[in-house]
């Protein structure tokens, strides 16, 4: 699924599906993973796909290439990243799922980061959407991740304190889905 942003793309809210949608103007419509209760008021008004959206799309798409996801999964992750960046309400950190890490690390927007699950040797891979002063909004950048009785799916949002994140470039580990993180180091 190779898609490229176009000037005819349009955001709209679909009440029947309770999801923000992106009309890709070629007969395809993307349905985001976020329900109305997670969206800002702007999400309920139709709006054009703007230049900033396109710039973020290319930034996230470039970074997603190192994720190990297939083309369709990358497209889904990138489009959900745009929704989260532009329309998601603030969420509280849920860092208690992850092991604290040594050092002071502050990720960049679009960076792939790793988190180690608390009390297990399993690791997860996240895409940073909006880095903050002490925590970052991230999306799950792997097919799924089991978190203490709950399962996160590809593209789901979670906010994580920076002291739980590690750059993938310095910490290769095995993910819970038996996929090895592609890292240098």
Swiss-Prot record:
GO cellular-component term (any): cytoplasm
Keywords of this entry: Cell cycle, Cell division, Cytoplasm, Septation
GO biological process: division septum assembly; FtsZ-dependent cytokinesis
Primary subcellular site in the record, as a coarse category: cytoplasm
Annotated compartments: Cytoplasm
The organism's place on the tree of life at top rank: Bacteria
InterPro entries: ZapC (IPR009809), ZapC_C (IPR048372), ZapC_N (IPR048373)
Intrachain S-S bonds: none
Pfam families: ZapC_C, ZapC_N
Subunit annotation: Interacts directly with FtsZ.
Protein task: Contributes to the efficiency of the cell division process by stabilizing the polymeric form of the cell division protein FtsZ. Acts by promoting interactions between FtsZ protofilaments and suppressing the GTPase activity of FtsZ.
Family note: Belongs to the ZapC family.
Protein name: Cell division protein ZapC
Species of the source: Edwardsiella ictaluri (strain 93-146)
Taxonomic path: Bacteria, Pseudomonadati, Pseudomonadota, Gammaproteobacteria, Enterobacterales
């Amino acid at each position: 699924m190779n898609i490229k942003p176009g000037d005819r793309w349009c955001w709209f809210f679909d009440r029947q599906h309770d999801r923000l949608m992106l009309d890709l103007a070629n007969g395809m419509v993307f349905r985001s993973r976020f329900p109305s209760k997670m969206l800002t008021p702007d999400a309920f008004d139709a709006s054009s796909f703007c230049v900033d959206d396109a710039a973020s799309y290319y930034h996230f798409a470039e970074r997603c290439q190192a994720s190990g996801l297939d083309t369709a999964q990358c497209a889904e992750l990138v489009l959900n990243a745009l929704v989260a960046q532009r329309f998601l309400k603030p969420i509280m950190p849920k860092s208690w799922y992850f092991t604290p890490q040594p050092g002071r690390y502050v990720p960049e927007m679009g960076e792939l980061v790793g988190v180690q699950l608390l009390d297990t040797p399993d690791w997860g891979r996240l895409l940073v959407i909006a880095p903050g002063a002490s925590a970052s909004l991230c999306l799950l950048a792997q097919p799924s991740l089991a978190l203490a009785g709950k399962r996160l799916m590809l593209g789901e949002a979670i906010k994580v304190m920076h002291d739980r994140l590690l750059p993938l470039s310095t910490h290769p580990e095995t993910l819970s889905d038996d996929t090895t993180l592609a890292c240098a180091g």
